[in-house]
Amino acid sequence: MDWYEKWFGKEYILVYHHRNESEAKQQVDFLLNHISISKNAKILDLCCGNGRHSIALKKLGYDVLGVDLSSELLDIARSKASESNLDLKLYRCDMREIPYENEFDLVVQFFTSFGYFDTDAENQKVLFAISKALKENGQFMIDYMNPDYVMDNLVEKDEKQISAEISIIQERWIENSRINKKITMIKNGETLFYNESVRMYSLQEIKCMLNQAGLMLNKTYGNFDGSEYNKDSMRMILIGSKNP
């Protein structure tokens, strides 16, 4: 089983509990301030997880589809949407194989959901799938890490006490252009192990991959505050469109 098939569930939510609805709303506000779409736009939230951004967009009246591989996270998204009386469309599939063509005005991918696969060819398939799913002149936003920032600010090990019953140890290292993480979780006396491994692409590498997929990069931001992208930026936020 690949790491991303095992990891994205309730334990993942515990580790990233600070990634909440308030943060999602701020990021959606940034998105809509930097992309022009109609009020009835069709939006694909690719790797939607527990639905934070899908729900924020749906509350604004957009026609949203959330897609993820994790049944567990989709169930959480479904429950959260129901609590808000939202009829949110959710679909389970691999991001390389989304079955849509010329369907969406906008595809978004938040919080480093690109670079999961072992080879560049497999990661490239994600961009081909995004391009295929977009309408002509459709737009995309990919929220990705800045490899320079990751390398310069790597915390090799940290420990967190999430609650009286849950503690987490995270160990990080860079190898073969990938940022790797081992997560050890002690939960109610039980020790659980998980991993993350994400390919670190430079901006130039991603530009080439986008071009191969028929996508044009129009603007790169360094964070959700709208700052310009540079080597010290925390994020690499890519905004662009499908070539006509």
Mark where each language-model region is.
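A short glycine-rich, Lys/Arg-flanked "PGG" loop and its adjoining helix->strand segment in the class I
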Residues: 124-136
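SAM-dependent methyltransferase
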Residues: 141-209
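Class I SAM-dependent methyltransferase "Motif I" SAM/SAH-binding loop
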Residues: 47-51
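C-terminal lobe and adjacent flexible extensions of AdoMet/dcAdoMet transferase-like proteins
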Residues: 205-244
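A short SAM/SAH-binding and catalytic strip from SAM-dependent methyltransferases
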Residues: 105-121
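A short acidic, Gly/Pro-enriched loop at the edge of an enzyme's catalytic core
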Residues: 96-106
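Class I SAM-dependent methyltransferase SAM/SAH-binding core
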Residues: 52-97
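Conserved class I S-adenosyl-L-methionine
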Residues: 1-41
